[in-house]
Amino acid sequence: MHGGLDRAFEGLQVRLLVPDLWQQEAIRALTDGFDVIVDAPTGAGKTYIFESLIKGRKFPAAGRQAIFTVPTRALANEKWREWKRDGWKVGIATGDLAEDLDAPVLVATLETQRERFLAGEGPHLLVIDEYQMIGDRQRGLNYELAVALAPPDTRLLLLSGSVGNPGKVAAWMERLGRRVRVIGTAERPVPLDEMPVEGLPRSAPPKYRNFWHRLSLGVMLSHYGPLLIFAPHRKAAEKIAWKVAEMLPEDDPIRLGDRRLEQGCSADILRLLKKRVAFHHSGLGFLERAAVVEPLAKAGQLRIIVATMGLAAGINFSVRSVFVAGTTYQDGPYERDVSPAELLQMFGRAGRRGLDETGYIISGRDSARLSDARPLDLRRHNELDWPTMIRRMHLAGEHGVSPFDAARELRDRLFSDQTVPLGFRPAGDGDSATT
């Protein structure tokens, strides 16, 4: 009798999710009408707050919308597919894809909502994931405007684990007339430890003695895999992937078993998968990235993944160990230093909740150390964006509002301790000072 029951329930897993106290507090604050800034490490469960609000039917109200904004198109696509699989009525808006834009839940890159914010419109709930982007030189203004122009009846949920001054952001929002709570935790779900490459086992044959051979073999012999390596640019990511693959046996190759997927993958990816290795960068095709590399990485089927640092914010899977190769990375035509906050985000991918007791940061002689990672205080980098200002003034004029008053109001709502000069004097102001 008991044996039959055992067989009947064989392979059945019951997963009971009990929210942490800080998650419960954030959910309660939002339903009580507060905006919430969540300060919690990568992997702690910040997205759970949004998912709980939707599943509990607390947001959005009938006829309104909840918008979850993310910094990359890849991440938007991933969350959209995930929530559709869960049965949600969810749309997507990115620079290259727009579907079901009026769905109760919308996943979007923040820039796609720009006109909505400028028109003074807003959803019932607006989530700004990775809100540290406010400090980004290129994209920060759009993030700043989303907060500055959100209507009073839009609840804001700001998520990050790499901001050092969330209290200052809260004070700015309070200056805008909003009720705000800062909620979070400093505790990581999986603690991190640092392991120098020199401390890993060395038993490679003489011809396999370069750094990448030692790293890949040492990590596998120590059972510290899967390993995620962050590389400075695409070519480096691919080169490193081939180097680490040289040391690994082809004893358990991944076979996709789907002709469509195999045809959608390059020969390089298919060859690397035989060693359970892959690279991950913006040059991958949609099928390669979204249907092959990312799902395999999430499922723990890859030994080593080599990703570009520029895509760090778009990575949504965890591994046991992380290694950051270099201190600079390619950002479009520019080379940028890796910031301490970016390191914090990359290192945060080490340690899988429920699988690992410890996550490992592998360090080399010239690579980033765990102590190099820390939150950074946010400050605005942008000067005024005049196309945005002129658009705001034009919309104000169409509604019978003084364009100059609209410009001043927008200026005064920016994330700045000092008044940003507009540099014009409206007609009729006589000898008054330039605004």
What are these regions (language model features)?
Residues 1-37, 57-58, 63-65, 190, ...:
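Helicase-associated low-complexity/disordered flanking segments
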Residues 28-36, 44-62, 82, 144, ...:
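Walker A/P-loop NTP-binding motif
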Residues 60, 65-70, 74-80, 84-92, ...:
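Conserved C-terminal RecA-like helicase domain
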Residues 77-122, 181-187, 194-197:
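Inter-Walker segment of RecA-like/P-loop motor cores
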Residues 110-113, 117-157:
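SF2 helicase catalytic motif II
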Residues 145-157, 162-244, 273-282, 366:
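Conserved interdomain linker/interface between the two RecA-like ATPase lobes of SF2 helicase motors
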Residues 154, 317, 321-377:
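Conserved segment of the helicase C-terminal RecA-like domain
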Residues 373-435:
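Long, largely alpha-helical accessory region at the distal end of helicase-like NTP-driven motors
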